[in-house]
């Protein structure tokens, strides 16, 4: 039973790390990346639809995204959504595809993005700490019910702390890599 608590906690912490990686992938780092448009939705027949489900997104060059909608009638809607978004990009519409040129980031914009990365990382760390708290509470319940001894509680508590430390270290590494990518000129 207590091993299950550790296994579940490890899985949840891994998911928190993966969620952070996905979230950081949507932050522009001066290079073209199709995941930049992951959070972008377009009103399509009355329903908000993610752009990546309405169009093929490719990266023909290091600083260029090419958006080819499956239905050409939504080209204008996708263009409007990009202009309204906080991406700071201006699409070039040639009637059948949209080209997004990714400009060099200014020093000021880089610093803003690093702050955003740190905020996302802190949220991931809070999630991991909450998972640790839940695991410790579950272990205390097991000890109270007599399923594990006090020594087992202490031992498993240390294991949960090791998992937490490892997960936070991974989050720090993910964050450091993304910051380096953003600050790279």
From Swiss-Prot:
CDD domains: RRF (cd00520). The keyword Secreted does not apply. Signal peptide: none annotated. InterPro entries: Ribosome_recyc_fac, Ribosome_recyc_fac_dom, RRF_sf. Keywords: Cytoplasm, Protein biosynthesis. Pfam families: RRF. It comes from the Bacteria. Belongs to the RRF family. NCBIfam families: frr. Responsible for the release of ribosomes from messenger RNA at the termination of protein biosynthesis. May increase the efficiency of translation by recycling ribosomes from one round of translation to another. This is Ribosome-recycling factor. It comes from Listeria welshimeri serovar 6b (strain ATCC 35897 / DSM 20650 / CCUG 15529 / CIP 8149 / NCTC 11857 / SLCC 5334 / V8). The lineage of its organism: Bacteria, Bacillati, Bacillota, Bacilli, Bacillales.
